[in-house]
Amino acid sequence: MKTIAIMNQKGGIGKTMTAASIAYLLGEEQGKKVLLVDADQQGNVSMLYDRYKPEGIGMSELLERHRSVGGSYKTTDLIQTTPYHNVDIITANGYLMRTNMNLLLNEKEDQILRFAAAMLEVQDVYDYCVVDCGLLLDMTVTNVLVATDLVILPVKIGGFEIEAIANMDEQLEDLRSLNNRIRMKILMTMRQKNKTSLQVEAWLKESSGQDCFVTAVRRSIIAEKATMQRVPLPKFSKNCIVTQDYRNVVTELLKDMEG
């Protein structure tokens, strides 16, 4: 199982839509077995997959009450099926805020290795684990990154994207002593075809030294409508331009991850 974390510390850049769309397309169209993990206390990707419950069990229990840390839950106890072929989910809700605090106060060495330990139980069940991370590099996200193969960094051109990339680079470098295989790939989202955007896009791809997806995800009102309807974009509109872009992203992703 390969783990892909979608994260950026800036909101409004299509992070959750990216996670939801990649998971859907890998499962429904590519026939891959996918475990979608919500690691954001807002629970937005859980909502898009119609599995959000304010009092439900999921990511909090995985990190605090899993049998690998003396609890009673197996990983499979916390996995739910979704309405979509080949995609299962571990949900999140507001309890993750409490979980982050509890892990921060816990001085045991395993506090940032808990997600990795729990995923060992299902590593032969799924082809991909796709994680929608929260905006903060908290204990939940740190746990995820320790187990991650690829970080996809969605970047919206037009404000502080250079700083966001530099910050993420620095944070991942700090984690490489625990996970030396982790790497980052930039995905341009909400692309608008104007001079400034095209210049920054060209710099990112050609001169920044960063690994970037060739595909840039365009901006469309259809994506916003899908979010309002709480449905993954490729299900809401199979042939819209943004779905086509994400389909191309998945093609690139599979070539990258599988050769």
Predicted feature locations:
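P-loop NTP-binding core
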Residues: 1-259
